[in-house]
């Protein structure tokens, strides 16, 4: 028997979509696979895939585990009261992605504040 679909409010949908964007963005910035991320927090990789595609949400404890991994790596996402998502990148991450950024953008187009 299929599970019933959950009905979500517009606010809950917005949170789920923000989570999806944050999950994928952080994982891509760090250059890790869905499998590796899943192993780190103790879930199956399809759980990460479903969360990133917006088909499901991670339980709060697993989201906190992900946020802790990202914070430790130097990534902090802030969702403002205006709904704008801002990314703070620590020096470790800047070093990791500096070469990729240099290939994609002219040097004068990159502004890094630490």
Language model: regions and residue ranges:
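Short glycine/serine/threonine/alanine-rich loop segments
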Residues: 32, 43, 75
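Residues within the alpha-helical elements of helix-turn-helix
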Residues: 29, 40
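A short, Lys/Arg-rich alpha-helix, primarily the initiator
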Residues: 3-28
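Conserved hydrophobic/aromatic packing and binding residues within compact polymer-binding modules
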Residues: 23, 34-38, 48-51
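Recognition helix of helix-turn-helix/homeodomain-like DNA-binding domains
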Residues: 42-58
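DNA major-groove recognition helix of helix-turn-helix/homeodomain DNA-binding modules
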Residues: 6, 60-78
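Helix-turn-helix/homeodomain-like alpha-helical modules used for DNA recognition
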Residues: 75-114
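Recognition helices and adjacent regulatory flanks at domain boundaries
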Residues: 5, 10-12, 34, 77-81
């Amino acid at each position: 028997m299929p599970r019933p679909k959950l009905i979500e409010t517009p606010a809950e949908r917005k949170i789920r979509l923000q989570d999806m964007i944050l999950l994928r963005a952080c994982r891509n910035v760090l250059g890790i696979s869905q499998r590796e991320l899943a192993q780190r927090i103790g879930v199956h990789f399809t759980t990460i895939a479903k969360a990133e595609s917006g088909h499901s949400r991670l339980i709060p404890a697993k989201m906190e585990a992900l946020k802790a991994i990202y914070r430790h790596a130097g990534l902090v996402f802030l969702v403002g009261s205006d709904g704008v998502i801002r990314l703070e990148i620590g020096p470790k991450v800047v070093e990791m992605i500096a070469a990729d950024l240099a290939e994609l953008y002219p040097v004068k187009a990159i502004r890094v504040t630490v």
